[in-house]
Each structure stands twice: as structure tokens, then as C-alpha cells.
């Protein structure tokens, strides 16, 4: 919402285009964000800047690339961020205090967690986790110092056993550190993961465990992660 106006970003199943739907009190209006190719707007993530304009990260399946779109008044500017193989799955976008975009996303071809940041002149891209694990979802937040924090869920096959985990990657301005918030063997923790930071920067990760069909929250306090069940049968 921007004021009393609802904004929805969605892929048009018939045309394959990425569209922006605006719902006013007196009616609705739709516009095309990106129509270059079919299924251009999969896995969308949206953030609003200080002027109420929308910034979108999404996967273009026609080009197998990560794309970023920015609203400027009534028009949209669209640019390809990363096109190295099949990249851009499960993107999550957040804006810093200067309204610059930060995007976490998955490189499906190499099974990497990647991060892209627009520095005002161009995109900086980095590999954050390259443990060759399947990454199912990402969620990014910017802390009070302007540094990105990323939560993501993975599966890793080792010694004939699948291990599923929720991880947390934190950037301090120089280096990335990676912690495991939750791990277990034999379960299937997949999508539906979301990260938020409280007023003191403490991360809270809500995730859905598809194995037992329950919703959990993981909180980091004093350097230690604790998890608790939020709801049974949440699926």
C-alpha cells in the first residue's frame, strides 16, 4: 500500500508479461512492467522507496536471468542484473537508506546463494554461499548500518542423508559470516521463509517446515539461535 492505494505485481498467465495492478477506491488500473519474452515475471519481490515508488526483482525464465525494474512516476525502467546461466530464482529485494536496491537470489545452475547491490553507478555481484546445496528461498533485510542480512533455506545431500537447514548470512561492511539457525536430517524444510530485524538489529526468521506442516520462528540472541513453533498444521 501507498497511502490508501494498493499495488500488486503479478505475472499475467495468459500473456506471460509482468504487470502492475493498482487498486483505488474508485476502481483499478493495470500497466505492463516487462513484456519482453514469456514468463518474464516469476518469483517477484517488491520494495517501496521513500517516495512511494516500487522497485521489483524477478526472474525472467525466457532469458534465465535476474531482472530489476524501477518505477519512476508512470513509467518503468527495466535492466538485467545477472545473466550468468540460470540465475535469479527466489529473489528478495530491500532498499537501504539511500533507496539503493539490494537483492538476494539463487543461481540454480551452480547452486549458489548470490547477492547484488546497486552502488549508484553499477551493480556489484557476489557469491555468498557456494556449498553446492539446493537453495529454496531467500529473504533480505538491511540493518541500521546499511548492511545486508540474508536468511535462506537449503538442502544438502551427504552420506546418503538429506540435511535441511535455515541459514543466516550477515555482512559487516568487510566480510560475510554464515550461521545455521536451524538444521535437521530427514525433514523437508523448503519455501515460505521471511526475515525481519527488530529495533536493535536482532534477526527473526519465520519459516515453514513442510515435513511436519508447521510454522516456526528462529531468533538470534546473544550469539545463539533458538527456535519455537508458532502454529501447527500451518500449510
Give, region by region, the residue ranges found by the protein language model.
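Extracellular, repeat-based ectodomains that mediate carbohydrate processing or recognition
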Residues: 1-235
